[in-house]
Amino acid sequence: MAPASEAGPAQDPLFSGLILPRSRILDAEALTRSILAEIDAAGPLDPKSARAIAVRQMTEAKAAGNRALSETFEARPREARGLIRAQAALTDGLVTAALRVACERLHPLANPTEAERIAVLAVGGYGRAEMAPHSDVDLLFLTPWKITPWAEMVIESMLYMLWDLRLKVGHSSRTVKDCLRLGREDITIRTALLEHRFLAGHAPLAAELDETLWNDLFRGTGAEFIDAKLEERGQRHKRQGGQRYVLEPNVKEGKGGLRDLQTLYWIGKYLNRVPSPSGLVAAGLLTRDEFETFERAESFLWAVRCHLHYATGRATDQLTFDLQVEVAARMGYADTRGRRGVEVFMQDYFRHATRVGELTRVFLAQLEARHEKREPKIMGLFRRKKRLKPEYSLVNGRIDVLDPKAFLADKLNLLRIFEEALRTGFLIHPGAMRLIAANLHLIDEEMQHDREANRIFLDMLLRHGNPERALRRMNELGVLGAFIPEFERIVAMMQFNVYHHYTVDEHTIQCISTLAQIERHELDEELPIANRILTDGISRRVIYVALLLHDIGKGRPEDHSILGAQIARRVAPRFGLTAEECETVEWLVRYHLLMSDMAQKRDIGDPRTVRDFAKAVRSKKRLDLLTVLTVCDIRGVGPGTWNNWKAQLLRKLYRDTVTALDAGLESLNRENRADEAKRALRELLEEWDPKDLRAELARHYPPYWQALSNATHAVFARMLRGLGETEIRIDLDPDPDRDATRACFALADHPGIFSRLAGALALVGANVVDARTYTTKDGYATAVFWIQDSEGSPYEISRLPRLTSMIDKTLKGEVVAREALKDRDKLKKREAQFRFPTHIAFDNEGSDIYTIIEVDTRDRPGLLYDLTRTLAANNIYIASAVIATYGAQVVDSFYVKDMFGLKLHQKNRQETLEKKLRQAIVEGAERAKQ
């Protein structure tokens, strides 16, 4: 029985615009003839042998076709539409050849009965003729009635051949009635049937299924189908992280991904029986411009997905960090001065994902207008909002424009509608969004500098509660970038590191939202100082504008703080700020990282650090503004970035700086701090013999009393009491204020002690987040390390005894740290592509006593040990280490002296040490790659 061909794939209009002519992909007719001829020439064969001939020839044809497609796509890496159709055409050829071999040679019937008919249909994505290189092949074997033994043998033989071709086949054998029943019961099956496509076999049977589905299943059930698909979409988004700007998006299932576009097409097809997405225009669901946006996004996303499949050799849809670099290179994105190609690629990705969201909104609005889609239940929550201004109307609980012509006659309305939405609490109707997006050209230079327009924008930031929703919608529609052209450059800009969870524009909006939450007393417990500052009063105009502009200089070769300040100098006056306010905004943008850097990269227990910071901020007013900006900036990076550790550092720096500004810089002297610490220790150790207490207070040098808490001084006093010369005492204790475990060590002093301790901690898998070491006048050393587990959390109390034992063994020489660390120095594969140039700086001004060596490089296990071992080998004494981690990047700041107790002033000494530190970093990085 030869398959019917009058409606087969060769004539399907879906296959126009293939990336290669069909003959160069696979000539199905020629392949089938060749297989049949070889089987015939071999004489009588058992089914297995005949099948082997077919599989061998089909394997060769499949390999040749795939090779041709892969090479062509490599040369034309954006032509995804032609590729996915070509992949489907190649699969069609293999499936139809397998059917003919099964029907005509393996299980031939001279006079088939009516029951012995079979139609083979493609369903799902394959039915749409959209296949990535490693997509599944979903087949429906359709029979008139209950499956016959002959049909069962044909299907089994086909499947064996297709499996032997290494195709991932999903299949079902059903009658028309089965399809109808199962389609009613299961929305996933119904969706797959919606996209059925006849391949080969008995064409009338396939036509019967088509008519039955449309007449008896799809008709009259549109609202039910829409609700199910939108519910499915919501659940899918939730599984994928719930937002568009995730670090490693899923190109198929993620928000703004291919599945969202396919959902629009499914709904349009279900309601209007459109044969392809272009039919959505004729159906009135999308405009021509919107459909072009649909096509551009779809082509881009399919290109990404196909490159993912080729790069991994399997069906991969997640754009992990390592694959982002490879796909960007495959698609022709190159590094430029100031930006990596992968960052430009991901910016394009997020912009397309945003447009998919816009299309979804206007599409669903059209359905609501036709009453195809039920009004959202949530709209009932908005019934008691403020009354709208007369130029607006309420449609399905959302603000729409009453008269589009009158609305556009005053271009400032393109801003006013967002203020109205904030003022009333209503959402903006997608129809109004469509009107705005189509008229962005009205936002010209004149409007950008218009005093009233800027007043409206500033009021939006300041007057109506949290402006987050309005800013995000303005950004997605292109209004924000049009009104502030300098902002356009950072829209959807990705920063290729693990630290920043959001694109630059989304980070900015998150920062402003955090500020609004603090103002509304929603974060009082978490952010007491920021809350108090805002309650006492600062310039709201200055802080909101500074937050809006603080990262506006990103994405260029220059330092983004310096460039951002220059941009702020131009932009801030447009908002109507006074000269003094503009100067303050410029200063805040220029130094928006200063407080964070001081708190996280310097020893804030050193009075010199606080004095230098106080000199930089100069006034309590600027300190307050910078503190609030810093808190919002860190919290806006992403979930989990703000923690007790950072909060404590910033609070201490703020309080000490306030003291310095109020009482004078001289108030920050070591003697005062030492006296206070000793007085507190006397109270904590009041049960001690006075002679022992005097000895403890006298045995330490002044720096010991500066940076440690009173409780830690008490711990060390007890550890040092009666300590033998060969004894090592270890105390591990949770420090919830720092989100870490405090590890205290007391032992006899010797060179390289910091390195030994760092190695022992690295060996047990501890991440060091801060450390201090001190020597006593009688030859002992005290060291405190704050450590976290591999998840960035304090160790569970139950693990501390075993951890103590493991550290003790390492320190006693039972384990050699460097050798044992070899197998632990590996980078995670997904993070291996992050590149951070190493910067090493020597600072002799930041501390009165020590040279500060700042090492900014790629983080990895064992790095701190390698650096401290190198310093120890060069006779450098380490007093403390401040570790600041930013995702895969780390800044280790070491407070050091040479063997004579002096700073490292000599240039040649610095250069030699820098060379050796760089060598240690390079050698460690090589080990990590192996």
UniProtKB/Swiss-Prot annotation:
InterPro entries: ACT-like_dom_sf, ACT_dom, HD/PDEase_dom, HD_domain, NT_sf, PII_UdlTrfase/GS_AdlTrfase, UTase/UR
Biological process, per Gene Ontology: nitrogen fixation; regulation of nitrogen utilization
Keywords, ordered alphabetically: Hydrolase, Magnesium, Multifunctional enzyme, Nitrogen fixation, Nucleotidyltransferase, Repeat, Transferase
Activity regulation (record text): Uridylyltransferase (UTase) activity is inhibited by glutamine, while glutamine activates uridylyl-removing (UR) activity.
UniProt domain ACT: residue ranges: 742-818, 852-927
EC number: 2.7.7.59, 3.1.4.-
Signal peptide: none
Gene3D superfamilies: 3.30.70.260, Beta Polymerase, domain 2, cca-adding enzyme, domain 2, Nucleotidyltransferases domain 2
Region entry Uridylyltransferase, spans: 1-387
KW Transferase (keyword) present: yes
Cofactor(s) annotated in UniProt: Mg(2+)
Matching Pfam families: ACT_ACR9_3rd, GlnD_UR_UTase, HD
Keyword Transferase: yes
HD domain ranges (all copies): 504-626
Catalytic activities: [protein-PII]-L-tyrosine + UTP = [protein-PII]-uridylyl-L-tyrosine + diphosphate; [protein-PII]-uridylyl-L-tyrosine + H2O = [protein-PII]-L-tyrosine + UMP + H(+)
GO molecular function: [protein-PII] uridylyltransferase activity; phosphoric diester hydrolase activity
Uridylyl-removing: annotated segments: 388-741
This protein's domain notes: Has four distinct domains: an N-terminal nucleotidyltransferase (NT) domain responsible for UTase activity, a central HD domain that encodes UR activity, and two C-terminal ACT domains that seem to have a role in glutamine sensing.
Function of the protein: Modifies, by uridylylation and deuridylylation, the PII regulatory proteins (GlnB and homologs), in response to the nitrogen status of the cell that GlnD senses through the glutamine level. Under low glutamine levels, catalyzes the conversion of the PII proteins and UTP to PII-UMP and PPi, while under higher glutamine levels, GlnD hydrolyzes PII-UMP to PII and UMP (deuridylylation). Thus, controls uridylylation state and activity of the PII proteins, and plays an important role in the regulation of nitrogen fixation and metabolism.
Similarity section: Belongs to the GlnD family.
Protein name per Swiss-Prot or TrEMBL: Bifunctional uridylyltransferase/uridylyl-removing enzyme
Source organism of the structure: Cereibacter sphaeroides (strain ATCC 17023 / DSM 158 / JCM 6121 / CCUG 31486 / LMG 2827 / NBRC 12203 / NCIMB 8253 / ATH 2.4.1.) (Rhodobacter sphaeroides)
Gene that specifies this protein: glnD
